[in-house]
Amino acid sequence: SDYIDQSIQGDMVAGVLNGNWIIPTMEAVTENSGKWEITTIPTLDGGEGYASNGGCGLYITANCGNVDLAKSFLAYTFGGSTQTYDNALRDGGVVTTVLKCADSDVYNEGVAFFNNEPIYKQIVEMGSHVPVIEQSDYHFRAGVYLITAIINTVNGSKLDDELANAEQQLRFEMGL
């Protein structure tokens, strides 16, 4: 995308508001090593902002032929030690926010690009502060409207007008 290829990798940004999956894209600009840090999201009220968007889940479907075996497998691979998560990070760049990984040696390693800070431990710790919210079928659409409102505000529109417009559009889509 233009955002990734031109803005981030073209060294045209002062910050990146995104999830941990964007880290390899940032690291591709090797001359920026040591210039980046991980932080929370700014908030309107001045508090610390923690958020999560995306992720994954592991499920045992109704069609599973051996539910007990599937449960045992998941408990063994993902419920015991941090080894599975450590290997996923080290070998594939897959980051978890499972709290026990904050104590893992792998998650506590410094990352050279980020001033040798243990950014993966920081991500896990930040994940522990994300509030639980109820999501609906309109969760992602609401995000699109809010992102548009932010962009329009940055480009000169009034924040209150943009937020009201975003709410109006979402309510219309929801049939309210």
Residue ranges and their predicted role:
Residues I4, D11, G34, G54-C56:
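Residues that flank catalytic or metal-binding motifs in active/ligand-binding sites
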Residues R141, Y145-G156:
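Solvent-exposed, amphipathic alpha-helical segments
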Residues S1, V16, K35-I38, T84-A88:
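Acidic/polar loop patches that form or flank catalytic/metal-binding clefts of enzymes
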Residues I22-N32, L44-V144:
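C-terminal lobe and pocket-closing loops
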Residues N66, G79, Q83, N155-G156, ...:
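Short, well-ordered loop/turn and helix-capping segments at boundaries between secondary-structure elements
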Residues S1-A28, D68, E162:
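Extracytoplasmic ligand-binding clamshell segments of periplasmic binding protein
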Residues A14-N18, E37-T40, Y59-I60:
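Structural recognition of the beta-strand scaffold that forms the well-ordered cores
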Residues D5, Q9, T61, A70-G79, ...:
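Non-transmembrane alpha-helical segments in soluble domains
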